[in-house]
From Swiss-Prot:
Chain sites annotated for binding bacteriochlorophyll a 1: 99
Pfam family, one: BChl_A
Residues involved in bacteriochlorophyll a 7 binding: 285
Source organism superkingdom: Bacteria
GO biological process, one term: photosynthesis
Gene3D superfamilies for the chain: Bacteriochlorophyll A
Residues bound to bacteriochlorophyll a 4: 278
An example molecular function term from Gene Ontology annotations: metal ion binding
Xref: InterPro entries: BChl_A, Chl_A_sf
This protein's name: Bacteriochlorophyll a protein
Length: 354
């Protein structure tokens, strides 16, 4: 069952509040491992003209009764048009162990292919990462004995666990890579782990892992870029924040998200504004796991427009209206939700004006 709510600000403001409550009755990615995870993220403008922001984040998780926490505060600014620089510090704790660290680095903005439906929503996006995680080749230098032992232990454990491949083969990853693979003309097949092995390099052994994904691949990258769309730096004239909680157990996954974002709507020309996307989309695009055909969704959406505004066009069509409050449920909306959950691009087109 899912409830979503979007409350929009008036005038030409792109800001809005987003609330999502979802209970997904599918086995989580780690079927036997109950997990709790809480995320708090604050983004504060320091000099919007230079894209200069301060990000504070706290990630807490409890997995198998062990509490893990990661705290980060970082200042990020544009160094050049192509490069952003980041300086920050943080602390990681696992159970009774904690470790403080600081970091400094730069990132080059990279671009990856997006479908026309997404491109229509976002005129000038900056994308992160490659197009999709398909046939990843990951090299990790193993430069001390502890790392080598850990790596070899992992390889042995995976190689000797009969159930590992069984449960992975038995589930479909439901996410946007379904579409990405179709667009790329690739056949959709089940997940295969091609192999994990160790090869020698000039400075000692190098861990190499080659994975082939079917449709779980691009979920996380796509999700991150979708969340990033909600944080356009040029509209960040006050602090933005998001608080989220994820609970998973053998019954499924429960999600709670509350956020105030600067990029909930965009100017669509002619006095119209477009709601950028449905809260379902970034959640689903983490790549959900479930039996592909056995998937039904009970979802509803509430959109609250600024006073005096009206919806001028809606696809899927809304079910009811009371002044500035519009509600979607069942019918075309339910079919649209199921389409998105099964990896469809799922264009969500809601235009509003005074």
């Amino acid at each position: 069952h899912r409830d979503y709510e979007i409350v929009l600000e008036g005038g030409s403001s792109s800001w809005g509040k987003v609330k999502a409550r979802a209970k997904v009755n599918v086995p989580p990615a780690s079927p036997l491992l109950p997990a709790d995870c809480n995320v708090k993220l604050n983004v504060k403008p320091l000099d919007p003209a230079k894209g200069f922001v301060r990000i504070s984040a706290v990630f807490e998780s409890i997995v198998d009764s062990t509490k893990n926490k990661l705290t980060i505060e970082a200042d990020i600014a544009n160094e050049t048009k192509e490069r952003r620089i980041s300086v920050g510090e943080g602390m990681v704790s696992v159970g009774g162990f904690s470790h403080s660290f600081s970091f400094e680095g730069s990132v080059v903005n990279m671009f990856y292919y997006r479908s026309d439906a997404v491109r229509r929503n976002v005129p000038n996006p900056i994308y992160r990462q490659g197009r999709q995680f398909h046939d990843i080749l990951m090299k990790v230098p193993l430069d001390n004995n502890d790392l080598i032992d850990t790596w070899e232990g992992t390889v042995r454990a995976i190689g000797s666990t009969g159930t590992f491949n069984d449960w992975i083969r038995d589930f479909w990853f439901i996410g946007p890579a379904f579409t990405a693979l179709n667009e790329g003309g690739q056949r959709i097949s089940r997940i295969e782990v091609n192999g994990l092995n160790t090869e020698s390099g000039p400075k000692g052994p190098v861990g190499v892992s080659r994975w082939r994904f079917s449709h779980g691949g691009s979920g996380m990258v796509d999700s991150i870029s979708r969340w990033a769309e909600l944080f356009p730096f040029d509209k960040l004239n006050r602090p933005a924040q998001v608080e989220a909680g994820f609970r998973s157990d053998s019954q499924g996954i429960e999600v709670k998200v509350d956020g105030e974002f600067p990029g909930v709507s965009v100017d669509a020309g002619g006095g119209l504004r477009r709601i950028l996307n449905h809260p379902l989309i970034p959640l689903v695009h983490h790549g959900m796991v479930g039996k592909f055909n056995n998937f039904n969704v009970d979802a509803q959406l509430k959109v609250v427009l600024p006073k005096g505004y009206k919806v001028r066009y809606a696809a899927p069509q809304y079910r009811s209206q009371n002044l500035e409050e519009y509600r979607w449920s069942g019918g075309a909306y339910a079919r649209w939700v199921e389409h998105v959950c099964k990896g469809g691009v799922g264009q969500f087109e809601v235009l509003y004006a005074q």
